[in-house]
């Protein structure tokens, strides 16, 4: 079974068993809603247990989560630095033109039907995501996720068609 990160427990919150979660999901309200089931993985990325969400609220830059059956700080302290994950069958449905990062990373990138590399990472520096393309014998290419650059994404065929605008490739 495949699991995908939704957040990391970075600390406890108060004495009543709440934890601070640094979320890495665009669907925090859905992932952390009461009754949701998440997998808890330890610091070495080994499955530890399944937890059920008892409550969720936002506080500053964190999601404050309480798990069913864990009602005291002593019950949750040991889970600091553990990761919360969701199974693939619980991923939210996306709109047309939206993708999960795991679907994009590893795809081949083409310009004018010439293979230029593979997506190795996706950065979120601001208004637009930036796709990092690993190229053989050249520096990585940074492509903003905008319509004038990313022309077509074909996940089933493992292909992305792009136009590298002037100034994006400093090796030309």
From Swiss-Prot:
Subcellular location: Cytoplasm
InterPro entries the UniProt entry points to: PRC-brl_dom (IPR027275), PRC_barrel-like_sf (IPR011033), RimM (IPR011961), RimM_N (IPR002676), RimM_N_sf (IPR036976), Transl_B-barrel_sf (IPR009000)
Signal peptide, first to last residue: none
GO annotation terms (biological process): ribosomal small subunit biogenesis; rRNA processing
GO MF: ribosome binding
Main location: cytoplasm
Tagged with keyword Chaperone: yes
Keywords of this entry: Chaperone, Cytoplasm, Ribosome biogenesis, rRNA processing
Coiled coil: none
Entry keyword Chaperone: yes
Classification via Gene3D superfamilies: PRC-barrel domain, RimM
PRC barrel domain segment(s): 96-168
Pfam families named in the record: PRC (PF05239), RimM (PF01782)
A GO cellular component entry from the record: ribosome
Domain notes for this protein: The PRC barrel domain binds ribosomal protein uS19.
Oligomer status and interactors: Binds ribosomal protein uS19.
Described function: An accessory protein needed during the final step in the assembly of 30S ribosomal subunit, possibly for assembly of the head region. Essential for efficient processing of 16S rRNA. May be needed both before and after RbfA during the maturation of 16S rRNA. It has affinity for free ribosomal 30S subunits but not for 70S ribosomes.
Family: Belongs to the RimM family.
UniProt name for this protein: Ribosome maturation factor RimM
Taxonomic path: Bacteria, Bacillati, Bacillota, Bacilli, Lactobacillales
């Amino acid at each position: 079974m495949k699991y995908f990160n939704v957040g990391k427990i970075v600390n406890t919150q108060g004495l009543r068993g709440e934890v601070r979660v640094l979320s890495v999901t665009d669907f925090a309200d859905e992932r952390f809603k009461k009754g949701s089931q998440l997998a808890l993985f330890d610091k070495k990325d080994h499955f530890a247990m399944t937890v059920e969400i008892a409550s969720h609220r936002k506080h500053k830059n964190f999601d404050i989560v309480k798990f069913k059956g864990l009602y005291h700080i002593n019950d949750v302290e040991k889970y600091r630095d553990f990761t919360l994950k969701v199974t693939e069958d619980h991923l939210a449905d996306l709109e047309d033109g939206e993708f999960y990062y795991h679907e994009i990373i590893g795809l081949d990138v083409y310009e004018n039907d010439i293979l230029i590399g593979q997506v190795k990472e996706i950065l979120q520096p601001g208004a637009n995501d930036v796709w990092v393309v690993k190229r053989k014998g050249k520096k990585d290419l940074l492509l903003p996720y905008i319509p004038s650059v990313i022309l077509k994404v074909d996940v089933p065929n493992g292909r992305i068609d792009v136009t590298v605008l002037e100034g994006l490739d400093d090796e030309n």
